[in-house]
Amino acid sequence: VEEIVKIKSSFNVIDTIPDVEPGKHILLIDHEDSFVHTLANYIRSCGATVKTLRHGFSESIFDDERPDLVVLSPGPGRPKDFKVPETVHACVKRNIPIFGVCLGLQGIVEAFGGELNVLDYPQHGKPSQLIVTDSNSVLFKGLPETFAVGRYHSLYANPEKLPSQLKVTAITEDEVIMGIEHQSLPIAAVQFHPESIMTLTGNIGLAIIKNVVAKYTQYDKIILNT
């Protein structure tokens, strides 16, 4: 359970981000995480409709729903426990944009051939200072160069084995990867929890979600031949 902290800030970046186009439909894949409903509410507050699906469904659901964006939720364990890499492949095949959170980032890394390592000290309910390393990042557009985020993980993306298709967009002070984006596809992810109370200052967490939702839902829905 997070400690609820009242945070005051004169900086509110959310006011600088364009609104999400009306009628956008997002699928949120639930990997058995207690934050999933909070994450869904953050996405809804951006103006999009959200349908939450528990993992384990048929791949054909993407053809039926034709979402504008798929969000991969956090969750316990490893990405393979929930077939997250397979979900990533299914979305890529259909040209569906993806946003991953925590386990979602790890699954994206593995889907493209990367590897995960285990932290020496698990970060569960721990705040860290994030450093934005890519000024052109979709996720962190208009945000400060550094800010506090809430972390809940023991696995992390091995930077030495990061696939060439992915670029690092943010790190911690000890250089743990906190943000990635695909070099050419509409795929992005964060290792921290944007919906955490610890990522609240100036509505930073909501701004990150609104950035990716506003940008990635602009893509046309194209179902590619398998």
PLM region descriptions:
Residues 49-51, 115, 148, 167, ...:
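Conserved beta-strand segments of alpha/beta enzyme cores
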Residues 1-86, 90-96, 200-226:
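N-terminal beta1-alpha1 cap of cysteine-dependent amidohydrolase-like domains
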Residues 34, 57, 125, 157, ...:
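Short alpha-helical
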Residues 102, 153, 193:
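Histidine-centered divalent metal-coordination motifs
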Residues 64-142, 146-148, 211:
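Cysteine-nucleophile active-site neighborhood
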Residues 136-185:
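Catalytic beta-strand/loop cores that center a nucleophilic Ser/Cys/Thr
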Residues 50-56, 131-132, 170-173:
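Short gly/ser/thr-rich secondary-structure transition/capping motifs
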Residues 167-171, 175-226:
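C-terminal and late-domain segments of enzyme folds
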